[in-house]
Regions:
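Generic alpha-helical scaffold signal
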Residues: 31-34, 59-64, 77-82, 438, ...
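Flexible beta-edge/linker motif
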Residues: 55-174, 188-223, 236, 253-262, ...
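N-terminal Lys/Arg-rich, disordered targeting/topogenic segments
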Residues: 1-8
Length: 644
């Protein structure tokens, strides 16, 4: 009985306490609101250099905050944000836990203005000091904690109920002005639906789905409603890329954070996807459909796409693993492994615009692709890179539109430079300059192999050791200094593909090299024969036949060791041949080191005798038409290697 009376007293006291708090809130809520707005404004001014201006502020109803004529202005630059009306209803009960959660938002006349001009930007206001401070906080608390806090804030500030109209995003730079309007947006406990418009193209887009603030779930579809397929607005202006699609589906199925470990679950898919960026591909890359069921994991020192994730690219299913670790030094890891797939389906599933030379191939058997990469920034020389295509009973039945067999006989070769047509010529006996493999001086053959690809006759098209060294060298230099292309890769690039320095061209080049080398479509001797007859060795000079005549007025079979090493030295920069000579017509002194390195390797491999090595002089006598083009002035060269 005593306990019952005590419980009633405690309950009454609690009710009175809550009532008192609510009463105080009702009495002092407007002054409290003005105080909070002032503190928020001071914090934004101090941390971001932003001035917050609010024309009017008051409570509407019990807990809804009504703001009018809101603006955010950077210290230097155009206004970042303006808003006519904004109504926000927070969750009162979450405030007692020290957490702000927005339950409902109404807004109209909102415009976010992104200005990026030569004289300044209004959104790049975070200083390097603040970025460094933020990075230090991440390292102190760990990646998992930082990402979990971001997700918590995102869901707390994304209201379950929202009604937005007449909102827009404006992007302005020195040459253009682009606007995307959010005509309407509605969200409640059951659904999300919105419509936005690209003002320039008049294209309309819709989004629909569901959202749960408390369960931390999002299921959203985005698709264009215009009859004509159009690019996603602002992507090109901000990134230089063009993106279009029929439908994109994004699902976040919740996340868990405990014991400094974070797990994020979800999936994403797209159909009718088209992408273009000049550094990725010359043509638009098109994918019929793609999807990924993902698990993103994070601990204090790392973030990774877990290997349990499963992705599909048209008919190809693969398991990706990506990891970034920051424990002592930065570590990067990437693993890819496809399922075993019928070979014809593999080729047909490759993206259009990226593997067009091989997509129509029909073949028996199965294929499976594997790749492994790991780089420790503290030990880049120990980089791990392994890439392979596993085949089982693989045999090509039909090449269809592919031209991979064009080298079986005489063919026409066209030369382009920077999209400009230079000339065409036949590679075969009909061309008087064509030189069979046996008709090329062994000195020249071995000089080129020594300088360009010493293991050509022993590898399967790829020199992984050279490629690993290239990765390490370029990473340490923070720029491109060294390539890893084999002669097989150079041949494929010049005969079957264009010379555009794009990721797509490099990927297709690798696949074609694998097809040629692993299936012995051509002998190594035939590959070298074609290579020797198409390589550029001077201004508008292509092939060893033309080069031998141009420089020395002789046939390729008669080339000496010194002449051969000289011609091999031209391969990186054939148009600069004249800068190899001084005013007297002799080779410049810096080439003596090149001669020494190449001849030493040739001697070590027993490609030349000790006597040939000892009497070799770093000099040649140019007697052909090239003699008239040699400049009498000294010129300093700045070397530039091809990235791809």
């Amino acid at each position: 009985m005593l306990m019952s009376k005590l419980s009633k007293r405690v309950l009454k006291a609690a009710i009175l306490f809550v009532f008192g708090i609510l009463l105080l809130f009702l009495i002092f809520r407007n002054p409290l609101l003005h105080y909070v707005i002032g503190k928020v404004g001071d914090k934004m001014k101090f941390e971001k250099g932003l001035t917050l201006k609010i024309g009017s502020s008051s409570f509407s109803g019990f807990s809804t905050v009504a703001l009018g004529k809101v603006s955010l202005i950077p210290q230097s630059g155009d206004t970042l944000l303006i808003g006519d009306m904004l109504r926000i209803r927070p969750s009162i009960w979450t405030l007692f836990t020290g957490t702000l959660r927005i339950k409902q938002v109404e807004a109209s006349g909102i415009q976010l203005r992104l200005v990026n001009k030569k004289n300044g930007s209004n959104y790049k206001f975070v200083s390097e000091e603040k970025k460094k401070e933020k990075a230090e906080k991440i390292m102190a608390n760990g990646y998992s904690y930082f990402i979990a806090r971001l997700l918590d804030r995102a869901f707390n500030f994304a209201p379950q109920k929202a009604e937005i109209s007449n909102a827009s995003l404006l992007f302005v730079n020195d040459t253009l002005k682009r606007e995307v309007r959010l005509n309407k947006f509605h969200s409640d406990v059951n659904s999300v639906k919105g419509e936005f418009e690209d003002v320039v193209s008049n294209s309309l887009w819709e989004c629909s789905g569901s959202f749960s603030q408390t369960a931390h779930k999002l299921d959203l579809y985005v698709f264009p409603t215009s009859a004509k397929k159009c690019d996603l607005p602002l992507v090109n202006e901000l990134t230089g890329a063009s993106i279009s699609f029929d439908t994109v589906h994004v699902e976040l199925d919740g996340y868990q954070y405990s014991n400094h470990e974070l797990k994020v679950f979800g999936l994403a898919s797209m159909s009718g996807f088209s992408f273009h960026h000049k550094r990725i591909s010359e043509d638009s890359i098109k994918v019929k459909n793609a999807s990924i069921s993902y698990l993103i994991s994070s601990d204090a020192n790392s973030v990774m796409l877990d290997s349990s994730s499963v992705a599909t690219l048209s008919g190809i299913t693969f398991k990706p693993f990506v990891r970034f670790e920051m424990s002592g030094s930065r570590k990067y890891s990437l693993n890819l492994q496809t399922d075993t797939i019928p070979a014809t389906d593999f080729f047909a599933s490759l993206p259009q615009g990226m593997f067009d030379e091989v997509r129509t191939i029909e073949a028996d058997g199965t294929l499976k692709f594997l790749m492994s990469f790991h780089l420790d920034a503290a030990q880049p020389d120990d980089v791990v890179f392994d890439c392979s295509m596993k085949k089982n009973k693989f045999r090509i039945r039909k090449f269809n539109s592919s031209e991979l067999m064009k080298m079986t006989g005489e063919f026409s070769h066209s030369v382009y430079e920077n999209d400009r047509y230079i000339r065409s010529f036949l590679v075969g006996p009909s061309n008087s300059y064509f030189t069979p493999y046996e008709g090329v001086s062994p000195y020249f053959r071995n000089s080129v192999l020594t300088s360009e690809d010493g293991s050509f006759f022993y590898h399967n098209g790829f020199n992984e050791d050279a490629f690993r060294k290239s990765i390490a060298t370029n990473y340490k230099a923070k720029k491109f200094l060294r390539g890893g292309s084999t002669i097989s890769m150079q041949l494929v690039k010049n005969v079957f593909l264009n010379r555009k320095k794009t990721v797509a061209r490099k990927a297709e080049e690798a696949l074609i090299v694998w097809l040629i080398e692993s299936n012995r479509l051509y002998s190594k001797e035939r590959m070298l024969e074609v290579y020797f007859n198409i390589i550029e060795l001077g201004p508008n000079i292509y092939g060893i036949g033309e080069a031998s005549e141009f420089y020395f007025k002789k046939t390729p079979a008669a080339l000496t060791l010194s002449e051969s090493i000289f011609l091999a030295s031209l391969l990186p920069h054939p148009k600069w041949f004249k800068y190899s000579f001084d005013s007297t017509g002799n080779l410049k002194p810096y080439l003596a080191n090149y001669y020494r390195i190449v001849s030493n390797f040739m001697l070590k491999k027993e490609l030349i005798t000790q006597q040939e090595h000892d009497i070799l002089l770093p000099n040649v006598q140019v007697v052909g038409p090239a003699k008239e083009l040699i400049l009498p002035t000294d010129t300093v060269l700045v070397e530039e290697e091809e990235i791809f």
